């Protein structure tokens, strides 16, 4: 008989074997996937995980910066030099006569040419005429002046840019000399101010100096005026034509003020950033300003004029600082009289002169500054006293305008070819002028320096405030 088969046990064993094979295959598959996904070795379970260090960027470590603009600052300056009366008496004219009959007046200016040429623009007051000698006139001094044309050549050579032609001697040689004077001066490429060839000429000028536009006016007093409006100068008959001279009369200042105010408005409308007026006024030989001139000056200040420079008294008069009664922020610098640049008005030479002050004059320099915001300010005023030295030390007479700088006093004798007596006279001249202008110059310079300091501090504060607001 055959033995009986155990089929149930076989079935169970078969199922277990298949299950083990499937589980083993699953483990192998999982290990393969893990090794495929990461090539890094397995991390030891006992080590702490590491973190890679990162370098912070500039933006993360520093606050953002704000570029601070520069404060407003000076971008250009214009220095204008003015000097006093060129009074050509016959003794002065005669010193210019050359052996060939021509004239040369270069020696008058020989010691001031550096000052004149170094300024950006230089101006002198021409107190004579150039009528020539072919129009019924000869060369003459007081009371009716007529000088050789060579004086205009000498002022040009010395570095002057403009001659003031409105004064009480403008009409000394009537209309022919009046007009020829303008033609001669303009023919040397120097400008004129105050008198005109035609009534249609503009009665003011604007000079653009280093980018700064300076408006200028020049007026003379007149002793009368006719029905046509033509002025009477120096007691002569009224001019034969009206509209050729800027003038005023003390008995009708309203007309003068109205006219000047109109011209000031016109100059500003035409772009003037600063204004100067030259006034031929006052009384001869007094070293102080009268109430009449002070009142006129105050009115001009109230019109907004920046600088007033006077002439005619033939002596130096004070410097002052005026405050506008209309706009307290506006100030005007004034030199009431520049004195004589050159003349023969010397103590002992002329009976009408009883003071040595007629030998004294000044080189008066004003400086306007333009800032980067296009505003213009009067920022500097300087004054060098001058003395007219009648020098005959080399055998020929010369009238020399001598600049008297106190710090160079020890050099005066050698530098200006002076005798000891002349040196002593020069020292007295310096002291006279300093006594007249010293206090006023200190007042003006102190004010201008304080204003500049305050202005630049305010500019800096404005920049700092803007920078803080931008943060």
Residue ranges and their predicted role:
Residues 32-48:
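Ser/Thr/Pro/Gly-rich low-complexity linker/stalk segments immediately outside membranes or between
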Residues 1-7:
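N-terminal targeting leaders characterized by basic, low-complexity, disordered sequences
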Residues 2, 12-36, 52, 59-471:
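Acidic, metal/ion-coordinating pockets
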Residues 43, 47, 52-59:
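Long, compositionally biased stalk/linker segments
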